[in-house]
Amino acid sequence: MEDEVILELRDSDCEEGGAAVHAAAMEREDWIPLLLARKCKVFLRASRVILSERSSYFRSLFSNFREAHSDHVVVTWNLEVLANILQGILFERLDVAPCSVADLLEGATFFGCDSIISECQVWIASDMLSCSRDNQDVLQYVPRLWKVATETGVPTIASACARYLAINFEDAGSGEFLENIPLLLFQAAVNHPFLTISSERNLFQAILRRCRFETRDCALELISKVRMHWVPVDFLAAQSDNSLLNSHNRDLPLEPPEIKSAGLRLSQYTKILNLTGCQQVTDVILFDSVLCSPIKVEGEYILHSFLNSSSRYSNSSAAGPFLNHLVSLYPLQEERTQFELMQLPSVSEEVNKPDRSGIPLLNSLRILLLGKCWRVRPEELFLWIKTTCSSLQQLNVSQCPQFSAFFLSHLASACPFIEVADFSRDLSVIHLATVKKPCTGKLLTTSYKKGSWDTHRYLVELHLTGHTELKDSELSLISKKCPSISAISLSGCSNLSDSGIAKFLQGHPKLRFLRAAITAFGFQSVCALLAASDQECNLEVLDLAYCTGLSAGALVRLLTRISSFLSLSLCYTNLIDDGLFLSCGTSLETLNIRGTQVTGAAISYTIRKNFKLTSLNFRDCRGAFSYEGLKEEKLDLRRLKAGWGVAHILANAKLPFLQTLHLGLGAQITSTFLRELPSRCPQLQHLSLSLQDLLDDDLNHAIAKLPFLTTLKLRHTLQPLSGKFLESLTSNLVSLKLEDVCPSLTNAQLASIATSCKGLRQLSLTACRCLDSGALSIISKAWPALSELKLEDCGEATREGAAVLLCLYGLQSLTLRHNGAGLPRNFIMDASYQFPLLRCLSLDSCDTSGHFNTPQDGDWRSISTIKIAHCRHVPSAFCLEGRGRRVHRQTEVMERGGTTLRTFIVKERL
């Protein structure tokens, strides 16, 4: 035919002389093999008219060049892409995929196929953007697609790429290809209104990673986009030596920001909101952030600028119409709840419609993490959840003492699809002590009314660790209203009885996860658990640590009946050998039998029987000392904590995968073992040695050859060390604890540690009596991101006070005892306001004049436990001061649990 032309398609990636395939006609059934053929040349016959109509390249070629009079035309391009383009030209059919759309767009632009470009735009707008967070593979092709769209002048596709990257920024920021994202695309995503991240911390980290090789001005411009008020304080403190952050001149967010500041970054695509450690978050900020976010309402993307700026920051005592509307919709108490700190803005009448059609919704939000957010009040959080994110599936308010277990009663109506709820608190320390005076309770705040309780049909995992106020009647109600629970943590719920726990277990026979450490778990609970096992027991995790009410016989019955355990903790219980010998399980991966009566023979038998065992703890098991059969066991452990009998295991063992090694009393490690430790355990990350006979040279040799070591803990060595081994510490170290090890440690040596270990997060020094007040300055300047600090019997460290430590904003645990009587009486109050994340504070009355002032009802803020030790002076002929030596008398312990405050007097120094 006259209008036909033979096209010779040459693959630009093939060498000359490659194999060819001939196609006599372009029939549809021949096209699929043609696409799949990996040939260097393809000859085919096509219509000259159709090519000219649908491609400006061919139209020009057939009009103005010699090919206009030739029946043979050579076209060189990537053969697979060109075949797809010709399919679109001749058959108006395209095969578009994430991996090929960039090449297709580039080819379509070159060949002038506007229809194909339009189809690419449609596919990107519909298929690619619709898969947003579901198709992770698409992300790796976005940078090239953006580059091609920018170079070929297709701004709609370039903007679509920026939007897609913004929506999936969380996945891109954690991927390996972050550095391959073009800077302009990265900037466009960061500035996009639909930027979706779970935490500002993740955005900050991604910017720091991406801008390592960019100019300073560029990095600062991007860092300015981070909403620093929602970056956890401890993370910001860790970045204090970052020159970029210092140049940005940002103050640490210790208090809630002004309401006019930028709110939380929310979008309609937000699935996870992680505010853990952002103690400055309040319930008002949660509401305000939703109102000011670009969220889809009634089919349109709008920025909620309907807020009345003139009345937005009104000091009126009455709540705005929006709040009144919410309270009228969801009354939580008989009297309507009002915000006390700040008032929400007034909003337009459209938002206040009874049908709530104008209220922004976070329909995609599934996980809400509010750990350590002690300023968020339960009543207002309930309103926020019910109004904006009723599809929530996971809620974490751990380390938030203001939340009690009965917040669950409101969650049932606020988010009926909740699956995981975490209300964990710190475990009480009282179980470790002998109580001299009984607990006295005091109501801190008026709790909200419990009200009616709908059934949680989907709740499968519940964490109530540390809820000492939880009663049997309340646990029984939880059991009735949460019938689907398969995982629960009741550790530290000391107010529960054995019968109360047993009743709960009877109602949940399909538990797979049970933590009941430090409870009254006893014979009745064992019987209930075994009754459930008669059906079909799937219990995989069981923690009964410190459950002293369990008899040896009850433990034997338990272990002989349940075979599904993967993790088992029975430390400091009445476990005996029969429990391990008669155990029917063979799938244990984690076993903790510390402080029990088992012998080495039983431990050896258990190791042989459970070949998947990766974590073993048998410290303080004195019966393991004399059994040499342990030396024959082959171990594939990741974590080993041991004392008596461990010498037999470590005699000739190589543990190439061991990451954690804790050796205590009875371990009897030798100098040879310590020197060979790096070759035996090359992956070691955590090393703890207690009550061992150590030498500086041996420690120095071992530490220097452990490149992955992050934790070093030395306690009560049999002879004092000079501290020479400290020269081998590296920048990888995160935790350093020297307790009664280096009495001669000086400020100069501490400064040397500060130089080599800049990333410390935990520091504990005990009996370092040569330190003075200069040590506090070294600590505060060297490690601003410390989360745990303990100084006990450290010379005169606090003789001049401890005000210099008040810049350690990330502290969560602080112990200062017998370091010099320079602490002011109001130190506890100062600490509660200066350390926004502080949970545990331990002091000694010897370090102040008189007694410490304790917080009033409303001043506890984030603190959950205060321990104040008291001493008495015993006359001594060797003491020249006349007062005698100090001897511990008792410890006053104040624990905040929910809305109550408990006070104990115990014998031990806790």
Please annotate each region the language model reported.
Residues 1-48, 87-99, 151:
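N-terminal BTB/POZ boundary and linker segment
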Residues 10, 32-41, 62-64, 73, ...:
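Beta-strand elements of modular eukaryotic interaction domains
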Residues 44, 82-83, 90, 96-366, ...:
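Alpha-helical scaffold in the C-terminal half of BTB/POZ domains
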Residues 50-62:
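Short active-site loop/helix that positions an aromatic residue
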Residues 64-76, 133-138:
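Interdomain boundary/hinge elements
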Residues 76-85:
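Eukaryotic helix-linker segments that join adjacent hydrophobic helices
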Residues 268-270, 275-276, 283-284, 290-365, ...:
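C-terminal capping region of solenoid repeat domains
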